[in-house]
């Protein structure tokens, strides 16, 4: 009997990617085979995002496009999961008759049963209380040397613009030993870089017994053999104690990079957003991080066009960006989401104004980024090699410690030999606004002694540069 083939399409954030990987693990554990081509899949799963309007539109477009595989391919069953389902299950069910099943964020563990059971309900949307554990099957969908590690699920904040608590439920932190066990399992599969994610990373542990917090978890993760880089994403600024800053500064495995969504700098807007901290607190926190963790790269995200955002508020934000000179920065245009207080606030900002404000901040950040990048020229950086560059086979592509996967720039290597997943020392010779260029100047001696090419069945080493010689 032929094995049923499954294709899974993921939209949204890294946390959604982890959910997809858990579903893939559940499906492969039940005997299904993963398929990269949707036209060849018997079952198609779409894991959606429902955070803002543009994400919802992208999710619906993907569902409609992949539904065509029922006529054009071999697909017999289409399943839609994730945040959009948790939020709009009844509406989606009525508008998308071609979808066989809808699973909410609390039903990921049910995916194999729903796919296999001809009598399964069409809508499976329990309360959003699922959280995976180290024992939960999971298939890493990134190259084996890097992975996301979700340390908690849900969020207890009440930001006026955000729908996430309704989609993901209350915060549920995973026990320290469970998180460490999953990290060790990933390391055993060849992972050297772990990116920690959560809806609110710095709130980790307050719901666990024993007053466990993030600064208790991190040293335990640093003890995991094989893990070389740990990076922190989605660090809510409200709760960054000195103990956490000290751990970041002290532990060499924790890369000097922190992703911290600040959203705005105007005190009036921070109050209306219910962010819980004012601009004085934010500035003091950023100064403390810069002083205690020399060389740290700070990434943030901002929202422009919030209800009531005046020109004065926006100019305050421009000055804040100019003053703080973040190494990495992204900007979202405010999206009014039904069910959030901000959606019903007066003084909604026109879309054309939002777009202009976003463009102005990003143009400013491009100049700041160019300044940071140029300062890298001449430095020697540890770079994690990913493989051949997408643009040309004559370059290797990698990332240094302050370039996160999927969201930041790339370090291109134009001369030298390295294996995918290898950490090498690269001297930077050129820079653009977001990317760097350099050549390998040092490798781990054990790696460097391995022959080129590798023995049959082993890794294939990669050479950057033109011409390619071997």
Swiss-Prot record:
> What cofactors are annotated for this protein?
[4Fe-4S] cluster
Q: Which family does it belong to?
A: Belongs to the methylthiotransferase family. RimO subfamily.
Task: Please identify the protein, giving its name as recorded.
Answer: Ribosomal protein uS12 methylthiotransferase RimO
Is Nucleus tagged as a keyword? no
**Entry keywords, A to Z:** 4Fe-4S, Cytoplasm, Iron, Iron-sulfur, Metal-binding, S-adenosyl-L-methionine, Transferase
User: According to its UniProt record, which reaction does this protein catalyse?
Assistant: L-aspartate(89)-[ribosomal protein uS12]-hydrogen + (sulfur carrier)-SH + AH2 + 2 S-adenosyl-L-methionine = 3-methylsulfanyl-L-aspartate(89)-[ribosomal protein uS12]-hydrogen + (sulfur carrier)-H + 5'-deoxyadenosine + L-methionine + A + S-adenosyl-L-homocysteine + 2 H(+)
Q: Which gene encodes it?
A: rimO
Q: Which organism is it from?
A: Anaeromyxobacter sp. (strain Fw109-5)
Q: Which cysteine pairs are joined by S-S bonds?
A: none
Q: Which Pfam families match?
A: Radical_SAM, TRAM_2, UPF0004
Where in the cell does this protein reside?
Cytoplasm
- Cofactor stoichiometry and binding remark: Binds 2 [4Fe-4S] clusters. One cluster is coordinated with 3 cysteines and an exchangeable S-adenosyl-L-methionine.
> Could you mention a single GO BP entry for this protein?
tRNA modification
Chief localisation class: cytoplasm
What does the record give as the organism's lineage? Answer: Bacteria, Pseudomonadati, Myxococcota, Myxococcia, Myxococcales
Against HAMAP family, the record matches this protein to: MTTase_RimO
Instruction: Tell me its EC number(s), please.
Output: 2.8.4.4
Looking at the record, the residues that make up the MTTase N-terminal domain are: 4-120
Extract the ranges annotated as region (Disordered): 447-470
Q: What does this protein do?
A: Catalyzes the methylthiolation of an aspartic acid residue of ribosomal protein uS12.
Q: Per the record's keyword annotation, is 4Fe-4S included, yes or no?
A: yes
Q: Where does [4Fe-4S] cluster 2 bind?
A: 155, 159, 162
